[in-house]
Amino acid sequence: MDATFPSQRNITTRPAPDRIRREKCKLAKRLRRQVGQAIADFGMIEANDKIMVCLSGGKDSYTLLDMLLQLRAKAPVPFELTAVNLDQKQPGFPKHVLPEYLSSIGVPYHIIEQDTYSVVTRVVPEGKTLCALCSRMRRGALYAYAETQGFTKIALGHHRDDMVATFFMNLFHHAKLSGMPPKLRSDNGKHVVIRPLAYVSETDIIAYADAREFPIIPCNLCGSQENLQRKQVGVMLKAWEKEYPSRIEQIARALGNIRPSQLADQSLFDFLALGRHSNTPLPNAHAWLAGDLANDTAP
């Protein structure tokens, strides 16, 4: 029989309020440090930047906006933040949630209304995931708005685990070592995209969003299934992290610790220059293998 008194059981099973507050403060401090470090490492924010924060209503983008607001309060340089959401006219989308939240915290915002949902559902065959085309159309709409409004940076809520998952997606399905960089210039050269959550784990974001009680909008309103390939990679990474804690962190660090001479990309390292003698060039191996070498006397 359990001889523990009820009051004693409550003490041992319920975290004390002070302890909960301390844990929340530690979590917020860790996220601020990681986001600040990413901003500094990659030069994400400059003086007088006009930053468009893409806000979907999910845990990642809420955390991104919250962190940038906290860091701006103590930043050594001034910069502007504007939250922008794309209303894609998905059925059941709660249009009131973001305006009410953003107004309550005093953040300037704009809602772009563009019916990409109808286009995607019409073009994509039934049973196929809508995510890829939906993402491209969403990106196009956001980039177009950023250009018309003169934003200098576009901030996205991708985190460390997203970056690692994208690396493996490209490795497994596209035979290339590439991922999701913390900072990039768009293909058309008009936009600089930043990912301030590049050092933050998804686990911490989930805990932080829960602690802050953000009004989360689900991302499955369209009824589309998650991309199967990405889902498989996610399952793999979660299994690794469970069996080998910190493995995802190690992989993320490796993405910034490249050794071109230890790989096989000829565009990154001049392997042909590694002849037996420094001033003796190697023969044209491609021509030789094709049988076109001028002095090839083989029968």
UniProtKB/Swiss-Prot annotation:
It is found in: Cytoplasm. Pathway: tRNA modification. GO terms for cellular component: cytoplasm. Keywords: 4Fe-4S, ATP-binding, Cytoplasm, Iron, Iron-sulfur, Magnesium, Metal-binding, Nucleotide-binding, RNA-binding, Transferase, tRNA processing, tRNA-binding. [4Fe-4S] cluster binds at C131, C134, C222. One of its GO terms (molecular function) is sulfurtransferase activity. Its EC number is 2.8.1.-. InterPro entries: Rossmann-like_a/b/a_fold (IPR014729), TilS/TtcA_N (IPR011063), tRNA_Cyd_32_2_STrfase (IPR012089), tRNA_thiolation_TtcA_Ctu1 (IPR035107). PANTHER family: AMINOTRAN_5 DOMAIN-CONTAINING PROTEIN, SULFURTRANSFERASE-RELATED. This is tRNA-cytidine(32) 2-sulfurtransferase. It comes from Xylella fastidiosa (strain M12).
